[in-house]
């Protein structure tokens, strides 16, 4: 059975969830995204010859910044004091793509799934932004939550 939507009140109006009575627990979430591109574009990134600089370093910093600002982007997200944000980028030459994995962690009253998803998404968008001059048809795909732990709903992990 599906749970109730927590951001909708009895009148059907959107509201920020009241987490004031919840206990602080350690919460962690991992998300991923893929950026598919032409082999030549990926090679440009990997060779360090991109005219805008280090694409992976820029995407990593953008993802970290985005996680910290998720509450400003997603209307009903709480501002969180994140204790860890990690963004890893892996080139997959055989698939002509980049895999991005983010990790967010805190000790608090609400989960960090949206922060992890935002970090992976913005890192992917940054790769697109930096490479759009050489390729317009880059595809961002398969953005998803991989795992979350902590809180009332417990542990979730996607099937491999």
Swiss-Prot record:
Q: Which residues bind substrate?
A: 76-78, 114-115
| Pathway connected to this protein | Cofactor biosynthesis; molybdopterin biosynthesis
One annotated GO molecular function: GTP 3',8'-cyclase activity
Coiled coil (UniProt feature): none
EC id: 4.6.1.17
The protein's assembly and partners: Homohexamer; trimer of dimers.
Report the superkingdom from the record.
Answer: Bacteria
Q: Which UniProt keywords apply?
A: Lyase, Molybdenum cofactor biosynthesis
- Could you tell me what reaction this enzyme catalyses? (8S)-3',8-cyclo-7,8-dihydroguanosine 5'-triphosphate = cyclic pyranopterin phosphate + diphosphate
UniProt-listed GO biological process terms = Mo-molybdopterin cofactor biosynthetic process
Q: Which residues are annotated as active site?
A: 129
InterPro entries, A to Z: MoaC, MoaC_bact/euk, MoaC_sf, MoCo_biosynth_MoaA/MoaC, Mopterin_CF_biosynth-C_dom
Which organism's genome codes for this protein? Vibrio cholerae serotype O1 (strain ATCC 39541 / Classical Ogawa 395 / O395)
Q: What class of enzyme is it?
A: lyase
Q: What does this protein do?
A: Catalyzes the conversion of (8S)-3',8-cyclo-7,8-dihydroguanosine 5'-triphosphate to cyclic pyranopterin monophosphate (cPMP).
Please state which protein family the record places this protein in.
Answer: Belongs to the MoaC family.
Concerning Pfam families, the annotation shows: MoaC
Q: Which CDD domains match?
A: MoaC_PE
Name the chain's protein: Cyclic pyranopterin monophosphate synthase
